[in-house]
Swiss-Prot record:
InterPro entries: ATPase_AAA_core (IPR003959), P-loop_NTPase (IPR027417), RCA-like (IPR044960), RuBisCO_activase_AAA_helical (IPR048571). This is Ribulose bisphosphate carboxylase/oxygenase activase, chloroplastic. The lineage of its organism: Eukaryota, Viridiplantae, Streptophyta, Embryophyta, Tracheophyta. One of its GO terms (cellular component) is chloroplast stroma. It is found in: Plastid, Chloroplast stroma.
Length: 441
């Protein structure tokens, strides 16, 4: 039973089994041909023999309504099929013989979504929390860094975005570690520099190094990987700390180079290499303790956006939970420990946890002997020693915390440098031992 199909273009002639073996069934649904076409049948075929049954395909005046399709139509949902079983079209490519592969992009053999995109969308996780690998990220810190980095990769109308973000604050407050957590959260592998690289015996070497690292990060961005330039302790390498530091030519060139990059972030050239091609813009994140020691034009608002990091009580508790996360310390004990030391930096609690292991190390040394420590730790066939995790109670933590605080007080109180200049005696060095009763033991 052949039927002639007439369309605007050339349409292949095909055999259409309109009835099968029974009677009364209509031709194939117009949904088979797409949503924008409809079928006009001149007459209904009453029996299995079709003499000259012809139908015409013309453009539809309106979209096909699902209510017009009958339940008996086996192809009624084919035009709207976006089910996952169509993934089999692409999964078989390259895995089975081409004889058994369905033709691509022909008829119904059209993958609604590729397998890679389907799996990626199915496995994607949207993490908007401020926890990374069990470590706490302060919400204000996360917000500042993510917004600054995102702005530098956007094209905002008539907006000059500062290239440099300066994170500064007290010592030991976790500025660098919080930055690294944010980078890990965003999937960024930063190009890192330290203050020690901002000085050299050769004039101009640090400035050239900054440009090299910047262009290295720019090349990574061109390859489709988000990257930033991260400089630790900028004020220690480029700042002036009173009369104890000497301002060198390299300090001047480092400041001038950062100012120039902030003004022209897409035109950073190396000495002797000048090309007209613009490089990708790279956000710069710097940390420091006191930005007032830096060159004032460098830290002006158009070049550097400044963020003073002063963790709140909630931030300190959150970070300490991450520090003691594997030790089984109750949350109420962590809160009490933090509240009893409000003036201490966050790094204090990390040093406190490390101090608790002193007893375990002391036991191990007494077991192997002092003379065998080197053989057991360096290139030992037995491997490094392992310890059972010590139980950390609040009383033990408070005891070691008081010891750390006492050492801090000794440094501030016993200033031997001033004593050496003023008198020949040792000052408070022996006086402490005499008062404590340990001098004559």
């Amino acid at each position: 039973m052949a039927a002639s199909l007439s369309t605007v273009g050339a349409v292949n002639r095909t055999l259409l089994n309109l009835n099968g073996s029974g009677g009364g069934a209509s031709g194939p649904s117009s949904a088979f041909f797409g949503t924008s076409l409809k079928k006009v049948i001149s007459s209904r075929v009453p029996n299995s023999k079709l003499t000259s049954g012809s139908f015409k395909i013309v453009a539809a005046d309106k979209e096909i309504e699902e209510t017009q399709q009958t339940e008996g139509d086996r192809w009624r949902g084919l035009a709207y099929d976006v089910s996952d079983d169509q993934q089999d079209i692409t999964r078989g490519k390259g895995l089975v013989d081409s004889l058994f592969q369905a033709p691509m992009d022909a008829g119904t053999h059209y993958a609604v979504i590729s397998s890679h995109k389907y799996l990626s969308a199915g496995l994607r996780q949207y993490n908007f929390d401020n926890i990374k690998d069990g470590f706490y990220i302060a919400p204000a810190f996360l917000d500042k860094l993510v917004v600054h980095i995102a702005k530098n990769f956007m094209t905002l109308p008539n907006i000059k975005v500062p290239l440099i973000l300066g994170v500064w604050g007290g010592k030991g407050q976790g500025k660098s570690f919080q930055c690294e957590l944010v980078f890990a959260k965003m999937g960024i592998n930063p190009i890192m520099m330290s203050a020690g690289e901002l000085e050299s015996g050769n004039a101009g070497e640090p400035a050239k190094l900054i440009r090299q690292r910047y262009r290295e990060a720019s090349d990574l961005i061109k390859k489709g990987k988000m990257c930033v330039l991260f400089i630790n302790d900028l004020d220690a390498g480029a700042g002036r700390l009173g009369g104890t530091t000497q301002y060198t030519v390299n300090n001047q060139m480092v400041n001038a180079t950062l100012m120039n990059i902030a003004d022209n972030p897409t035109n950073v050239q190396l000495p002797g290499m000048y090309n007209k091609e613009d490089n990708a813009r790279v956000p710069i994140i710097v940390t420091g303790n006191d930005f007032s020691t830096l060159y004032a034009p460098l830290i002006r608002d158009g070049r550097m956006e400044k963020f003073y990091w002063a963790p709140t009580r909630e931030d300190r508790i959150g970070v300490c939970k991450g520090i003691f996360r594997t030790d089984g310390v109750p949350e109420k004990d962590i809160v009490e420990l933090v509240d009893k030391h409000p003036g201490q930096s966050i790094d204090f609690f990390g040093a406190l946890r490390a101090r608790v292991y002193d007893d375990e190390v002391r036991k191990w040394i007494s077991g192997v002997g002092v003379d065998s420590v080197g053989k057991k730790l360096v290139n030992s066939k037995e491997g490094p020693p392992t310890f059972d995790q010590p139980k950390m109670t609040l009383d033990k933590l408070l005891l070691y915390a008081s010891m750390l605080v006492q050492e801090q007080e000794n440094v501030k109180r016993v200033q031997l440098a001033d004593q050496y200049l003023n008198e020949a005696a040792l000052g408070n060095a022996n006086e402490d031992a005499i008062k404590s009763g340990s001098f004559f033991k």
